[in-house]
Structure formats: C-alpha cells, structure tokens
Amino acid sequence: MSTGLTPPPQPIKRPPKAVTWIFAIIALIILIAPMSVGFYTDWLWFGEVDFRGVFSKVIVTRIVLFVIFALIAGFVTWLAGYFVTKLRPDEMSAFDTQSPVYQYRQMIENSLRRVMVLIPIFVALLAGLIGQRSWRTVQMWMNGQSFGVSDQQFGHDYGFYAFDLPMLRLVTDSLSMMLIVAFLIALVGHYLMGGIRAGNQMTGQKSFVSRGARTQLAVTAGLWMLVKVAGYWLDRYDLLTKENSTFTGASYTDINAQLPAKIILLVIALFVAIAFFSAIFLKDLRIPGLAVVLMLLSSVIIGAAWPLMLERFSVQPNRAEKEAEYISRNIESTRYAYGITDEDVTYEENWGAGETTNEEVAADSATISNIRLLDPQILSPTFTQQQQLRNFYGFPDQLAMDRFEVDGELRDFVVAARELDPNALQQNQQDWINRHTVYTHGNGFIAAQANQVDEVARDVGSTRGGYPVYTVSDLQSNARAAESEDAEQLGIKVDEPRVYYGPLIASATDGADYAIVGDTGDGPVEYDTDTSSYTYEGAGGVDIGNMVNRAMFALRYQEMNMLLSDRVGSESKILFERDPRSRVEKVAPWLTTDSKTYPTVIDGRIKWIVDGYTTLDSLPYSTRTSLTEATQDAVMPDGTPQPLITDKVGYIRNSVKAVVDAYDGTVELYEFDTEDPVLKAWRGVFPDTVKDESEISDELRAHLRYPEDLFKVQRDMLSKYHVDDSGTFFTNDAFWSVPGDPTAAEGRQELKQPPYYVVAADPETGESSFQLITPFRGLQREYLSAHMSASSDPNTYGEITVRVLPTDSVTQGPKQAQDAMMSSDQVAQDQTLWRGSNDLHNGNLLTLPVGGGEILYVEPIYSQRKDQASAFPKLLRVLVFYKGQVGYAPTIAEALSQVGIDPKAAQDIEEVDGTTTTPSTDETDTDTDQPATETPTAPVSEAEGIAAINDALSNLEAARDGSFEEYGRALDALDRAVDSYQSAQ
C-alpha cells in the first residue's frame, strides 16, 4: 500500500580503501614508469661504454642533495607549522568567532595532522627537486683546485670564485628561501589560528598579535636577517663580476662607494637582526619596526644615492682617468680567462709595412701551392652525387677539413664518412625491419685534396671537369688493389670501413636512431654491399637478448616489434645514442662540446674527433660572453646548435679531446690542457674517466684541429682585448671587428665571416702549417686591420699569431675585395650570361698573408645546372685579388699569373685532353679583365661528324644505367661531337 511519501535519497557509497589504494598505485606507476625505463636503459648504456661510474656518481649526488634539501626544507616548514599550532591562542574572543577566517580555523583544526604532513611534504619535494639540480656546484666545491692566480682587489685565488663562492651562494640563497617560506607559513598560520588579528574601527576591534606569534615571527625574521648579513658579505665579491657599460668588474664607484656601502649595510643588518630578536622579550614591536625602516632608508641612501652621486659628480667628468686602473684589471683578467695572454698570442706589429715583391710572393710555396679550391660548405651535394653509391647513404650538409701528407708535402683535404642517412630511405625501405635491422650502417671514408680538381672546366655547359679528386677507403675499394694502395699511401686505408655511429646516422627526424644488430641464427641480414650482407661483430651495443632488456627498450621507443620480431634474438644488441657529440656529452656531463665534429682515420679505423670545453660562469674582472652569440656567423646564423651547460661564460678552455669509434661507439676522453684547474676538479669528481695527455698517440695528435667555437670566442675577445692601454680601450679607437661574409646568401652577408681551415706558411718558420684563419677589419670600417691564425700542427698547436697591419696605410678588406672582383667587366659579363641556366655559388673568400707582407684574396666560383634535378656544384672559375688587381680564370695558376704572380708553385690541373696548365707570367696577359679562351676544335668531315654523333648517342644510351659521372661524360662527348660537326659545315 502506497503511503505517498518519497523515500530518502540513498547516501553515496565511498569506494573501499583497497580500490583507492589500487588507483593510487596505478597512477604512481604511470608517473614513475617512464623515468624508471629511462633510468634502467641509461644504466645499461653507461655500462656498455664503460662509464657507469659517471652515471652512478651523478645519480648518487643528486639523490643525496634531494634528500638533504628535502629534509631541511621539510623540517623548517614542519617546525614553522608546529609552532603555529603550539602557540595558537587557547580561547577565541567574540570578535574572533565572528571573523570570516574562523571557519578556516575550524577546518584546519579538524584536519591538523593531515595539514602538518602534506604541506611539509610538498615543500620538501619541491626543494629537493630544485636542490638536486645543483650537483655540479656541490661536486666542484668538494673537488676545488687552486688557479695560482689571485684577484686584484681582495687577493683571493680564482679558485675561491670558481668553486667556493657558488657553493656559499647556494647555501645562503637556499636558507633565505626556506626562511621566507617559514615566515609566510607563520604569518598566515597565526592569522588563521587567531594569533594575529587585524583591527577594524567600524566594529571596534583592535589589532592583536599574540606573544607566541610575535616570538615566532621575530625569530624567523631575525634568522633571515643573519642570512642577509652573510649575503652582504658575499655581495662584495660579486662586484668583481659586475657588468658595466665599458668593461666588466668593479669600477671606481663600486670600489669607493658600493664596497663600503656593503660593509655598512652588513653592520646595519646585524643590528636589525638583534632588534628582531629583542621582540622575544619586548612586547613593543616598534623597535623591530624602526629597525626595518632604518634598513630600508640605509639601502636607499647608502646603497643607491651615495654611489649615484659619486658616479655623477666625480666619475663621469673624469671617467677615463678614474676607470684606468679597473680597465687594466679587466684587460688582464679577460686575456687570462680566454687564453689570449701575451704568452698565448704573438703580435706581429706593422706587418707588411715594408715592400714585398711579386717574386717573394711567388716564392711562398707553402701558401701558394696549397690555395684551397674546394669549399666544404658547398660541395656536400657533389660528394653525395659522386660518392653516395646508394640512396640511403649520405654526407652532412657541411663537410670537414683535415690534412694529410702527399709525397712528403702537407696538404689539406675535404673529408667525410659515408654515413647511413635514415631520412633518405625510400618508402619501401622504411618498414621497421628494413630501417632498424637491414640499413644499419654506412660504408667508408672519403677524402678529396682541397687544392685541386679532376680537370679544368672551361665551359659552363660541360659536364666534365671541376670536380674533386677522391681517395676512397671502403668495402669496395679495399677489394681493388690500385684504390686500396692509393688510400694506404695517403694514410686513410680503413681496416673496418663500416660506420655505425655518426651525426648523420643520428639525425632521424623521429628520434629513433637505433639499430638492432647481432646474430639471429638466420645468417647475416644487414646490408653491406650489393652482393653481401653482414652481422655486426663489434663490442658496442646493449644486450637485448633477454626479455627484461627487450621490454625496457620496447617501452623506451614505444615499439612492439622489439618483442614480436624474429629479427631480435638471444644474441641481439641495440645500438643507440649514435651521435658522437651526444655520446661525449653523456659520459662527460660537465663538458660543453664544439659545434663541429669531424672524421679521420686512426690505426686503420674511422674515428670521430670531438672538442670538449670546460667553462665557468664568471671570473673576477673577466668579460662574460654568450657562446651562442660568439659562434654566430654566415654558416651558423643561430650560433652553436649544441646544448650548453651555460650560455654566458667568463672562462673557457679546450681541455679535452674526445674520440668516438665509428664502428663500435667506444668513447675515449683525453686530457689536453694539463694546466686547467677546472679539468683537474672534474677529474677529481670522476676519476679514471679522462686519460692523461701523454696517452694521445702521435697519429691522433697529427689530426687534432684547433676548434672553431673556441677560435670564434677568442677572435671576438681579441677584437677588443688586443689593446694594452686603458685610455685607448676606453675610447674604442683601436678596436677591430670581424667582417661580414660578402659571399654569403642574401640576408646573411652582414653576419660574420666564418673562420677557415687552410694549409699555409707558418708565421715563424715559413713551412707548411695547418691553420685556422680569420681577418679583422677596423671598427665600423671595411679596411683590413689584422689577420689572426691559430696553428693545429702538433709541435706548435694552439699558437695564435695576429698580424697587425700598419695604421698609416690602407689594405682592402674582404668586402672591398669582393666588390672589386665581382664588378670586373668579364666577371659581370659571365655572371649575367651564365645565371640564366646555372646557379652560381661563391665559395669561401680566403684572406691569405703571402710573401711576408702582402694579402692575397682567393675565391672559387661554382656552377650548378638549373635544368637538371641531379646537378651538383663544380668548380668553374677562380677569382683572385692582389694589390688592387683582379685575376679571373678557370685555374688558380692562370688567375695568379693575371695579377703578376708567377704560379710555378700552384697545383697543376689537367685539361680535358689530358694536358696540364701552368702558365707563366711571361706567357699570360696580366690584364685582369681578359677572359681565358678555349682551344678551337679541329674541323672534321661531314661523314666523320655524323658518325661521331651516332657513336656518342649510342654511348649516351648505354650510360643511362651507369653512374652520374659516366652519364655526364657521355653527354660531354656528345657536345664535342656536335661542335666538331658544326665547325665542319
């Protein structure tokens, strides 16, 4: 029988605690799983490269710091909350019960235990996560070294600023932040718990601070002021790294106003701390209040107004004299910090002031015979088309430079490893099995002598000539006696030409650069050559033969095929982290690596050489620089692409040379600066990870280069810090600048010209030397002011020479030389004619000191057909600029002769018919605007012409299935046959 009454709603049942715990555990696993997978696979990887000690030291240090910061921050937070609850009023007034915060007090008291746990845990976790990031600072402090150099103001060794001061700052900043959090908890907590009450005139409520609240807030504030006292003491040292408008370091105002102000404020802060502590015993808060007002007024008057007045009325009218001492300090410290002291740099003042004859220039065979014609920034497509072999091989966009001996003479070479390019795989090659188990490695080492090409290319339309002369060591050439002998004579014969590690291999756009290798029981499956397959036999790689490891990597790369594919067996390994630079950065997380890595051949194996830098954020009076900005140029408009420990540095050394084996990925770190205290500190942190400098083999040392990024940083510094006199430095009159690159693409010509590796005469001995060079122009002027070179030769490595040109005469700079060359009548005429069907590329504009006193500019011109998808750049012409004259010809010898330099030392280049061209100044017109003319084709009969055309067409058809080079030669033969036939009509 219905009563007409609605039954009461059923209460919502809470899920059982077990279900709640299950969901919580699942959520925790989801959060922790990715981190655990990364941790485990990295642990395996570090074991594979034999650097697990680095991994363990970093992890343990970070965990310890996490625990220390978490415990201290959690305890301070808990203690603040504990005193809030302990010191809260026992009774509430009528005003308190009517307060809107009363309900919050009730909520807090009802869940007091939970609040007292959750808030400290949250703060502890946050502090731990922040604190563990400072592992480098802590380890550097624990292993600090002496520099043997002291600052000019306080007399402390630089080691104090490099290792101790950052640690002291970490401690004071951390304590300061923790005390601020504790103060806020006390303030808010006492307000909610009734210990602090704001007054209200409308209700007649008076403000109120309980004794407990006053005591807790006063003690916390007093402790914070004591930390501030320590902060003021450390602030004195920070003045030495302060950046001013003219220089870095403490200025006259800083030393005579800011420094005394810090001491005075320190004393006042100490009195303020005492005033806060007095509030424990005094009910009157006016004493701490007055102390705070005194502190604020002192900060404004003593800390700001006094230095400002001294700056305005004493320093500004006499800045050059007042700042002279401090500018001198800045010059001295900056030179030391960047390795450009007088011990590191040799200045040749008034270089070229005397008369240098053309005969002396021609006799400079070390430079003239090594003039570089191949531009590694342009020729990557040429290498790719002529040496690619298969579509899945490739070369980096920017090739590298190295040097080798040819017939006892040092020559520079464009070098590259033929790597696997994962982004070039065709659609049918991109399934998981092909990509990760078949196409796993590259093949071979390629070198092309930089001062010669195969043949002279006189005709822009010809497909012959103007291409590099390659020496190759790969699987195919090793099987051919003649090519193998050529490689062996050059010193690049590779016993193991397979390339499993390299920057191009690691450039997969999806980040999956791994390869699965090893014996699967079904025989070799990796592509090796068209007629053979291969099974990886190297020591590199992480074992994934067991299901645990396999599952972990399947999770890391989110790839089920690792678990399901038959290509993964009990003997399988996974190769990953295949970029040489990333491998070095991972095993040496304290290094900043150079943006360029390059391959070479050491002991019959392809090795990648990576330059490593030790850096510091700052040193006293040392000018800081941005590594990103300093490395920007026309080739790298965005600066170094490498991850940086810190972008702005005040100290840098190329302390480590790293070598990565291209076959098994082995990483070797070698000490290279035996005097660097920062490296010594890191070797203390990670013992037995860096080999002694004495262990560098002679073969490896012969291929070490002066690193580009360091050179760029040093040239930026030398543009200012070559100046000795503080007065001259202050006026900027003698500053230099790096010229823009006039050969760069439109929009980049104002960017700095990159430095170039060349083989040229050693500044002291005149012998052939492998150098990194760059010109300087005057500040806001285009005329050449100086020329800088750094030696890479084993006996003189790192010696920097700066040739300073006379100031009473002018020498055209790179832009002026480029303008003169490109405005030459014949050059302009040819460019206009050729651009219709060709893309013309201006190669590197080399600024070469020659003959002991003259400057020679050399620039190769490359052409590339527009109407051919497979076209690639070739050397077409060579431009030279010398003493206001322009040389323009298909060969460097002809171009030199046009400007009056006997080219007897220049490299001979074969003509198409097999002859060589080496004109002398007696045989060649030196008129700079006269183009070279082609040898006329001998006339033939009509029947012979038709027969020759038919033969050429047959050869062209037969060459369609051959290489691009064979097809190009067939096209060229057809062109010659047509020309011969037309000349007979």
Curated annotation (Swiss-Prot):
Domain of life: Bacteria
Bilayer topology: Multi-pass membrane protein
Disordered: region residues: 906-944
Principal subcellular localisation of the protein: membrane
Membrane-spanning intervals of the chain: 19-39, 63-83, 115-135, 176-196, 215-235, 262-282, 290-310
Biased composition, class Low complexity, residue ranges: 929-939
Pfam families per UniProt: UPF0182
Keyword field contains Cell membrane: yes
Keywords: Cell membrane, Membrane, Transmembrane, Transmembrane helix
Any one GO cellular component localisation term in the record: plasma membrane
Subcellular localization: Cell membrane
Family indicated by similarity: Belongs to the UPF0182 family.
Protein name: UPF0182 protein cgR_0895
Organism: Corynebacterium glutamicum (strain R)
